[in-house]
């Protein structure tokens, strides 16, 4: 009976350990990101995605890292992954709108802005800024 309890205990420890380590990858990666250690944090966010492919926050932080590295293709890919997993992610939506504004994709910006107005709760103050930037760019194009 005691052997059975020991085996059961060991089994439980092994089952719990991987779930704890998954969370540690994200937490440690976020801490490194906040310290400005982008390469180290990028590796840990990618590692977290391997163990937890539905973690939208890891994709969001990877998008931020790729934005800092000026790698637009990877940035957009990770933003889209974030929005696929969490369509109401305000930060990802705002990043995508900003990216599309820089590329002068006005129709997409208008479409995304409508969605952004529906989902915004913390970044609603950015809506006026988006509309102003869109108006300024359109005015420059007309002149």
Model-derived regions, located:
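Register position in tetratricopeptide repeats
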Residues: 34-35, 68-69, 102, 119, ...
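Alpha-helical segment of the N-proximal tetratricopeptide repeat
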Residues: 23-47, 51
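Canonical positions in the second alpha-helix
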Residues: 47-48, 81-82, 115-116
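Canonical tetratricopeptide repeat
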Residues: 61, 95, 129-133
């Amino acid at each position: 009976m005691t052997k059975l309890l020991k085996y059961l205990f060991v089994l439980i420890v092994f089952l719990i350990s991987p779930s704890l380590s998954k969370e540690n990858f994200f937490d440690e990666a976020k801490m490194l990101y906040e310290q400005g250690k982008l390469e180290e944090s990028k590796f840990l966010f990618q590692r977290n995605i391997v163990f937890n492919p539905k973690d939208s926050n890891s994709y969001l932080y990877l998008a931020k890292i790729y934005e800092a590295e000026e790698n637009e293709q990877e940035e957009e890919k990770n933003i889209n992954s974030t929005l696929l997993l969490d369509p109401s992610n305000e930060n990802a939506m705002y990043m995508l709108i900003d990216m599309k504004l820089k590329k002068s994709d006005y129709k997409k910006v208008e479409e995304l802005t409508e969605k952004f107005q529906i989902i915004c709760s913390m970044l609603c103050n950015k809506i006026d800024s988006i509309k102003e930037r869109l108006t300024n760019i359109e005015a420059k194009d007309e002149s």
